[in-house]
Amino acid sequence: AETCGNGIRCAAMSILTKPWEANPKVEIPDTIDLGLKSSRASVRFLGEIREGRSTQLPLAAVGMGKARINKENDDYARVTAFVAKIAKDLAMPQLLLDWSLVSLGNRHLIFSLDEISPELIRKLGPIFQTSDLWDGINVHIIRSKAVTDSDRRQSAQALGQAIEELYEAYIWERGAGETQACGSGACSIAASIWAAGLTDRSLWLGVDMPGGRLYIKQPSKDDQITMAGPAKLAFKGKVTI
């Protein structure tokens, strides 16, 4: 992958928690700067570490850069023809009603549909991989989702601002297949929604994926897209190289 927002977030959270585990009184930084292979990433922490029955970590917010949407991509006309052919071959004209091509480090095809499911992404994902346009592409199917009072409370507590827009998504990642979550994908989904004029980009937007929820915002079109979400320890281990 060209970029991995989830990986950046997890790396920053690991850096945050290790000194805290050794000494809970250690001062927690507001930001951590990470040096990547081709760039640098700054991660902000939204909130504080809260102790209780289970330790609650703050959300980690990462600047993900700016997206190129549809005609901002040089090959948009060719991709449009390719998508039209696939829609015809599958007898799925609904694919053409609301779709976007987004580049944000990685490339993404996003289809907004009335009905989505894991079975559908397993059907569509592999089909879009084979093309002379790319060596694979991330594919997402999305739909709008009702925001509950609980969603508003949780987001207000975590972000200082309640969300008013929420989308559900399933993901097929280039070279990996169906995955639980995709950080650059969630940002690209939000970018496609803003470009369509469906919501205010300066407000946090929620994207629900099988692996959990991410929050996305972009104060203005000239700013970086910011992705915020949790990171939790899955396991520890050692690798001998």
Where are the predicted features?
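Active-site proximal loop and beta-alpha junction motif in alpha/beta enzyme cores
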Residues: 1-3, 8-181, 188-241
